[in-house]
Curated annotation (Swiss-Prot):
Coiled coil: none annotated. This is Large ribosomal subunit protein uL11. It comes from the Bacteria. SMART domains: RL11. Belongs to the universal ribosomal protein uL11 family. InterPro entries: Ribosomal_uL11 (IPR000911), Ribosomal_uL11_bac-typ (IPR006519), Ribosomal_uL11_C (IPR020783), Ribosomal_uL11_C_sf (IPR036769), Ribosomal_uL11_CS (IPR020785), Ribosomal_uL11_N (IPR020784), Ribosomal_uL11_N_sf (IPR036796).
Length: 141
């Protein structure tokens, strides 16, 4: 078995099921010589069950212009906004609070995100979620 030579690793955040050749995807992949439409079709097929979720994706481009990609869980801030039905966090997080997260919601987000975190303990993941929530102007009960 021969190992393909990696020439580039591209990291993007793309809404699930909505990849298209427009910027930022097209220029990033075109510069690496990747078939842009091929990536868009594969990504959209793989993420059709997560429409609209902002998904981090890591694209590995090989010397023969083939690629593989790994999709990750949405960022914690996106999960919090989705849970509380918010458009954005507070512009002044220390003064203006825009919502409240319960411990059950924090735990659900932490469990979902732990797959991508380098954390073993649920308590550590919960603290990270709580910190992100506070920086967005959201109270944690």
């Amino acid at each position: 078995m021969s190992v393909k030579k990696v020439i580039k690793i591209i990291k993007l955040q793309i809404p699930g099921g909505k990849a298209n050749p427009a910027p930022p995807i097209g220029p990033a992949l075109g510069a690496a010589g990747v078939n842009i439409m091929g990536f868009c079709k594969e990504f959209n097929a793989a993420t059709q069950d997560k429409p609209g979720d902002l998904l981090p994706v890591v694209i590995t481009v090989y010397a023969d212009k083939t690629f593989t990609f790994i999709t990750k869980q949405p960022p914690v801030s996106s999960l919090i906004k989705k849970t509380l039905n918010l458009e954005s966090g507070s512009k002044i997080p220390n003064r203006n609070k825009v919502g409240k997260l319960t411990q059950a919601q924090v735990e659900a987000i932490a469990e979902q995100k732990m797959k991508d975190m380098d954390i073993v303990l649920l308590e550590s993941a919960k603290r990270m979620v709580e910190g992100t929530a506070r920086s967005m102007g959201i109270d944690v009960e």
